[in-house]
């Protein structure tokens, strides 16, 4: 609050601007962060950025059985899905680490502004 008892809009705007900059920096960090989910003991791996976007999929040739193409295709599909889920779990953890403190800052509200 300012000396007149009203809201200090300048302070509120500065705080909002600072939070926006912190959010943008955290989002940039997430874009640059890489995680690798894997399955099948490493036969399949999926690389994702911190926002959860898949950037690479790697399948070890040992995962392929040339004598049973149909079974191999289904197995590989299952392994890819499991690797993606593993990567998503890691992404969620990273997002909580990077964005959690900012979300808590929002919950703290703006001084002198009830409920915000």
Curated annotation (Swiss-Prot):
One cellular component (GO) term of this entry: bacterial nucleoid
Keyword Cytoplasm tagged: yes
UniProt key word DNA-binding: yes
Pfam family, one: YbaB_DNA_bd
Keywords: Cytoplasm, DNA-binding
Record-linked SUPFAM superfamilies: YbaB-like
UniProt subcellular location: Cytoplasm, Nucleoid
GO terms for MF: DNA binding
Domain of life, per lineage: Bacteria
UniProt-listed NCBIfam families: DNA_YbaB_EbfC
Function: Binds to DNA and alters its conformation. May be involved in regulation of gene expression, nucleoid organization and DNA protection.
Quaternary assembly: Homodimer.
Protein family membership: Belongs to the YbaB/EbfC family.
Protein name (Swiss-Prot/TrEMBL): Nucleoid-associated protein Tfu_0045
């Amino acid at each position: 609050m300012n000396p007149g008892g009203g809201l200090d809009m300048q302070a509120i705007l500065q705080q909002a601007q600072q939070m926006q900059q912190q959010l943008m920096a955290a989002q940039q960090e997430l874009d640059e962060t890489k995680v690798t989910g894997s399955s099948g003991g490493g036969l399949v791996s999926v690389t994702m950025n911190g926002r959860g976007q898949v950037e690479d999929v790697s399948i070890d040739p040992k995962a392929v059985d040339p004598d049973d193409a149909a079974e191999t295709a289904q197995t590989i599909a299952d392994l890819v899905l499991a690797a993606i889920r593993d990567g998503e779990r890691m992404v969620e953890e990273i997002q909580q680490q990077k964005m959690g403190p900012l979300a808590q800052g929002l919950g703290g509200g703006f001084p002198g502004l009830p409920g915000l």
